[in-house]
């Protein structure tokens, strides 16, 4: 998966979290800290999608959200 595909997948996950009223940073941080997919909504397949992504890249993405 190239960088653009990864970023698109992460944006879809962030959008799904927002649509369900969650704070994406908090939910993704919980997912990374606990390695627990229940932090990610099932809405629009977000939970299934995040589990297909490289965990280290997800951690880097979450760290980049901090600013």
Which residues does each PLM region occupy?
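Intrinsically disordered, low-complexity, basic-enriched segments
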Residues: 1-67
């Amino acid at each position: 998966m190239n960088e653009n595909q990864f970023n698109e997948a992460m944006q879809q996950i962030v959008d799904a979290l927002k649509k369900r009223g969650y704070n994406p940073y908090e939910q993704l941080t919980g997912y990374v800290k606990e390695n627990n997919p229940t932090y990610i909504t099932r809405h629009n397949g977000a939970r299934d999608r995040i589990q297909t992504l490289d965990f280290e890249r997800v951690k880097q993405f979450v760290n980049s959200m901090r600013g």
